[in-house]
Design a protein with these regions (language model features):
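A short, internal acetyl-CoA/4′-phosphopantetheine-binding micro-motif in the GNAT/acyltransferase core
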Residues: 44-50
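C-terminal structural segments of small proteins and small subunits
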Residues: 68-103
Length: 104
């Protein structure tokens, strides 16, 4: 798989960020828009693409979009929460009251 085959987008109609490989959805992260934030609820990689690092790539894109839009991230999805723990450069996207959970 080449980077040229990968497309990342915010599919706002379906309330999810998508990563497509060759035009087909390979991974997605669902969210709900809440006041000033995106609440991430579920991230999934299709079985044919597991182990390729696509979920991490997708979440980095999603969190960059959250930052670009001036929003906060609410990581209810365990994968998104774990990603933020491993990448503290995104910790500022979590509202201050919720950051304690990431500082353990």
């Amino acid at each position: 798989m080449h980077d040229a085959d990968i497309q990342l987008c915010d599919n706002a109609d379906r309330h999810r960020f998508e990563l497509r490989v060759g035009g087909e959805v390979a991974a997605f992260s669902e969210y709900n828009a809440v006041k000033g934030a995106l609440l991430f609820t579920h991230t999934e990689v299709l079985p044919a693409h597991e182990g390729e690092g696509l979920a991490s790539r997708l979440i980095a894109f999603a969190l960059d979009e959250v930052r670009r839009q001036g929003l906060h991230a609410i990581p209810a999805c365990p994968f998104v929460a774990a990603y933020i723990r491993k990448h503290p450069e995104y910790l500022d996207l979590v509202r201050e009251a919720g950051r304690r959970a990431f500082l353990k």
